Design a protein with these regions (language model features):
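Generic secondary-structure signature for well-ordered alpha-helical cores
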Residues: 80, 157, 208, 212, ...
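A residue-level signal for conserved active-site and pocket-lining positions in enzyme catalytic cores
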Residues: 29, 106, 134, 188, ...
Length: 366
């Protein structure tokens, strides 16, 4: 697909015959704006006006640059699922088969959508993320955190997860979710939560009594003034778990202890996991657990800090969801470019260097 044709297949929400601007032009202008360090529709409009000559090299712009009000109105009315399908199809094309790959499932609030008098963001997005390629493969808007329980199976069902390893935090510790993952011929590593039908207590108590007699994988890190010791213990012995057979595919339990010193203060955390993996070393499964937080560091953090997503005050209709899709597409393009500079500097470079912007966009050619 040529970059100039990227958005042609998305249905225009405007009335036929009354639209001054092409939808494909509008979407490409916003994508370019977010690649070039813009925040919000007004900054995107300012950027497009300054770079109109460059944009005309690959856009039609029959009536010039659309106003920021037009950009906002289109994004409010645009079908989120169609725009998301473009992001997802691009990601799938790059990632290819998911066999033996780690897929991370996690949710994120768009904190800028918190309305006056409320504590909860009105928009929360659940994502499936390819850990190695650092790309979003699927996403779904949910009403609140508890809705992840029903949304996770729906989201995973959109992908061929055969032979992949799905990691989820404790919200995914549900029998229906483990069953679906195994039925789809994949494996899981899922965090345990303390209110999960006594399972947490049984696993925690068992490791407390037996960890001294089990082989442990110990690693140490020292960075940014923080010393950390990580201990991972894996056991395939499950006869101490009541109704273990109800957890489809359950083959192992894992204990992870993190002991660290931060500014001369000692911090200790203990976490427990269930998994369908068998025949793995503790170090291997510990690696999957640690990499699970890659979605926080490589996607959520950059959306918030590099793209200031939480500071975005766009709240109405479909605009917040559509903008997060554009941000993820921009993040994927910037992250995959081989330039050895920070993502923040890449955005600023794209704003200054038109050839660099074209290099980023050319990654969409699939």
């Amino acid at each position: 697909m040529d970059v100039s044709e990227l958005f042609f297949e998305i249905d225009d929400p405007g009335q036929e015959g009354k639209c001054l601007h092409l939808l494909s032009d509008i979407l490409m202008i916003v994508l370019c704006g977010y690649l070039c360090d813009c925040e919000g529709f007004e900054e995107v409009y300012d950027y497009a006006c300054d770079k109109e000559e460059v944009l005309r090299e690959f856009l039609e712009l029959p009536c010039g640059i659309p106003s920021h009000d037009t950009l906002n109105r289109v994004f409010r009315r645009l079908s989120p699922t169609q725009l998301e399908s473009l992001l997802i199809n691009w990601g799938k094309e790059i990632v290819g088969l998911l066999s033996q790959k780690q897929l991370i499932v996690d949710g994120k609030q768009l904190r800028g959508t918190v309305e006056a008098g409320h504590k909860q963001a009105t928009v929360q997005i659940l994502s499936v993320w390819a850990e190695k390629e650092r790309l979003c493969l699927a996403q779904k808007q949910i009403a609140n955190k508890t809705n992840e329980i029903t949304a996770i199976p729906e989201l995973l069902s959109t992908l061929d997860i055969t032979d992949s390893i799905v990691s989820i935090d404790a919200i995914g510790c549900q029998k229906a979710i483990t069953q679906l993952i195994v039925e789809r011929q994949a494996n899981y590593v899922i965090g345990l939560k303390s209110n999960q039908d006594g399972l947490y207590t049984q696993v925690a108590d068992w490791f407390e009594r037996h960890q001294s007699s089990l082989q442990a994988e110990i690693s140490r890190d020292l960075e940014h003034g923080r010393a950390e010791k990580r201990t991972v213990i894996l056991s395939e012995k499950l006869n101490f778990i009541d109704a273990a057979q109800e957890w489809v595919g359950l083959k192992s339990v894992i204990y992870v202890e993190s002991s660290r010193w931060v500014n001369q203060e000692h911090q200790l955390s203990k976490r427990y996991y269930i998994s369908s993996l068998a025949g793995y070393w503790a170090a291997q499964v510990g690696h999957f657990i640690r990499r699970h937080w890659g979605i926080e560091n490589q996607q959520h953090w950059h959306l918030d800090v590099t793209f200031n997503e939480d500071g975005c005050q766009v709240r109405k209709d479909h605009a917040p969801r559509n903008l997060t899709t554009i941000r993820k597409l921009a993040l994927g393009l910037i992250s995959r470019h081989p330039a050895k500079i920070s993502l923040k500097r890449k955005r600023k470079k794209a704003a200054r260097d038109d050839e660099f912007l074209i290099e980023l966009l050319n990654q969409l050619n699939i």
